[in-house]
Amino acid sequence: MAGNPKKKSTGIVNAAIGALAVVLAILIVWMMNLVSGIQGTARIINYAGLVRGKTQRIVKLEISGQPQDGMIADIDAFIDGLRFGSDELSLVRLNDDAFQRKMQELDDYFQALKQEISRVHAVGSNNTDIIPISETFFSICDDATGLAEAYSQRKATSLSALEKYI
């Protein structure tokens, strides 16, 4: 006795629908993961820019004899948040080796800049390298911001490609 061909084709269709549903579910989870990764990158780019701009303001004010210990502490917190993530600042940690290496360089250079600011307090700005050090720091900040933008663009491109399949 042969099996009912109608039942057999219905079973194949049901199996195909089930397989497609599983594939779709996997793609949706993948897309949600990409969206989650993109959501925090705008704040990272913004804070990298804040580090750059606020540091230049600190240098200008310090040179004019107005100590900025509070803003220096802010920059330390921003750099720490950019490197490791921060719930307080709502910053995610970018899982990007180039960005993380640049943030380590930025942190190290900010420590040198703070030492030079201390020298400004002691001997005056004309007797220090505060301007060239702050210019190098500005350049490192530009690089870090560019790396964060590139990371964000890669994530957005991946999401766009995935959306085409869904």
For the regions a language model picked out, list residue spans one by one.
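Extreme N-terminal signal-anchor transmembrane helix of membrane signaling/transducer proteins, especially
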Residues: 7-34, 164-166
